[in-house]
Amino acid sequence: MKKICVLFCMIILYTSINPINSLAEVETAGLTKCQESPAFTKRLNNSVKKLETRLAKYDANTPPAIALQTQIIKTKIRFNKYAKSGILCGTDGLPHLITDGRWNHAGEFMIPGVLFLYITGWIGWVGRGYLRDISQTTKPTEKEIILDVPLALKYCLSGFTWPLAAIKELTSGELVADNKDIPISPR
């Protein structure tokens, strides 16, 4: 029964991430591509102009002048990357993230979001394993304060498979505690 429930949840998750009727090139809430946005170009020109105004106050080969020249180059490169990436900009000229599930915008939000969830899951799974292991030692509180580095490294190196291990423990019943093992505080 638990396997069927897990399979059903995975199917629901997959279909919610992959919408069938997504339209690829529909404008979203009045947003335009940054390279076509006059406000984006104006913002670039204003940023470069401010830096060039500051640059005019210094002699040519002084450290502040070199730092400002480098900052001007980096600003132009940053704006150029936004323009080439296809990210959409608003009327203010600022890039906006589209989080509606379309795959052509996956690089903006979904991929970093999934990566964030994977890394936080890794940290939680490794910490859980370490705490469960040290709870069986004679001084668990001491090992929470002063880490047992070899043991912690063992869990860190094996933590990258945490999604598979979590599914295995969920289907075998190890992940979820019984109701009788959970204390209820009297009120």
Curated annotation (Swiss-Prot):
InterPro entries for the chain: PSI_PsaF, PSI_PsaF_sf
Signal sequence, start to end: 1-24
Keywords for the protein's UniProt record, in alphabetical order: Chloroplast, Membrane, Photosynthesis, Photosystem I, Plastid, Signal, Thylakoid, Transmembrane, Transmembrane helix
Disulphide linkage map: none
Predominant subcellular localization, coarse grouping: plastid
Subcellular localization: Plastid, Chloroplast thylakoid membrane
Transmembrane portions of the chain: 106-126
Highest rank taxon of the organism: Eukaryota
One cellular component term from this protein's GO annotations in UniProt: photosystem I reaction center
Gene Ontology BP term (one): photosynthesis
Chain's role: Probably participates in efficiency of electron transfer from plastocyanin to P700 (or cytochrome c553 in algae and cyanobacteria). This plastocyanin-docking protein contributes to the specific association of plastocyanin to PSI.
Protein name, per record: Photosystem I reaction center subunit III
Record organism: Gracilaria tenuistipitata var. liui (Red alga)
Taxonomic placement: Eukaryota, Rhodophyta, Florideophyceae, Rhodymeniophycidae, Gracilariales
